[in-house]
Amino acid sequence: MADKEVYDDAVEERVINEEYKIWKKNTPFLYDLVMTHALEWPSLTVQWLPDVNRPEGKDYVVHRLVLGTHTSDEQNHLVIASAQIPNDDAQFDASHYDSEKGAEFGGFGSVSGKIEIEIKINHEGEVNRARYMPQNPCIIATKTPTSDVLAFDYTKHPSKPDPSGDCSPDLRLRGHQKEGYGLSWNPNLSGNLLSASDDHTICLWDISGAPKEGKIVDAKTIFTGHTAVVEDVSWHLLHESLFGSVADDQKLMIWDTRSNNTSKPSHSVDAHTAEVNCLSFNPYSEFILATGSADKTVALWDLRNLKLKLHSFESHKDEIFQVQWSPHNETILASSGTDRRLNVWDLSKIGEEQSAEDAEDGPPELLFIHGGHTAKISDFSWNPNEPWVICSVSEDNIMQVWQMAENIYNDEEPDTPASELEGQAS
């Protein structure tokens, strides 16, 4: 049995390497930007910060990212990194792409592309997830391997971590019994933070009136409707009292903080045929949300009629762990997970006619497959300032900042004969 596993692993590794070579060869035709950076340790989390710095006289703009570390028994850190992204003045030409250097040296389109670590703050154990507070992006909440949720104001910490390894968060949020991943700041109520946990509960804290001395904040409310690990939680983007949660009990639940019943959601739906790992509310359409599952599908929902699943997006070959709507386009969402692929979907193409050849690559709503990762994708983030730019991080320390070629989302014909494109863009 063990021999077969070793053989299967070797075959899989060879397939992954072959696919990666094909992907790399085709990057100039499929992308307007690809930057690949090997982090010292893998990050389980990534989120673009909302600020942009535009240095005068340069052909790039500087964006910043929140990352974490997942080390092997070494000191862990909450990390702020910067990425130089070429602006419209920067000129690229696919023919200048050095295929030998390829993605290892920054890759296609990143003449000036640099990724640098700016701030490292000591953290207790790996950073399961880190998210900034929209009303004050200096404040970042993190999920740890313990039951505590931590909050850091990164302006109050030195950019180089204390060598002692002491972790001194500005606040410690208590209420869970176990670790977890889900974390969501309320975009409409400053300081209101939700967290999902393996202990089957969701905690809500309000840190706006947090103690200045004690540093410990107890949960304001604990929601107990799920009967298994709660994987993710998200506030509605327009209604300050509504949020959604998903769990290993295969359910999607919609909650209203105005309700006195913290054990019964206002809506509960059997969303998938396996664990539900993630959810995302559409930023433009107040009734629409998406969920991603271990059943390999992304489901589309309408809050006005949750009994009926609007659509199921099918193309992933393994568990889905992250789903996020584009901040710039109402019909665009992306999903990623264990199959090492990040899929970008376009709702407006659902039901379009396809040739038999196109159908082999995936359904018409599958706009693009990002094939640059050779390990499970842990998290990704749409850039809020640069349309179509995504940062994705995988378990093998790789972080990629990329933007698909404009002709793909503008429905134009590529400049390249189709015969040269090998099965990545559909």
UniProtKB/Swiss-Prot annotation:
In the record for this protein, the WD repeats are positioned at 47-123, 129-174, 182-218, 229-270, 276-313, 319-370, 377-404
GO MF:
histone binding
Q: Which family does it belong to?
A: Belongs to the WD repeat RBAP46/RBAP48/MSI1 family.
Name listed for the protein in its UniProt record? Histone-binding protein RBBP7
- Keywords, in A-Z order: Chaperone, Chromatin regulator, DNA replication, Nucleus, Repeat, Repressor, Transcription, Transcription regulation, WD repeat
One GO cellular component assignment for this chain's record is: ESC/E(Z) complex
Q: What is this protein's function?
A: Core histone-binding subunit that may target chromatin remodeling factors, histone acetyltransferases and histone deacetylases to their histone substrates in a manner that is regulated by nucleosomal DNA. Component of several complexes which regulate chromatin metabolism.
GO BP, one example? hematopoietic progenitor cell differentiation
State where it is primarily located. nucleus
Q: Source organism lineage? A: Eukaryota, Metazoa, Chordata, Craniata, Vertebrata
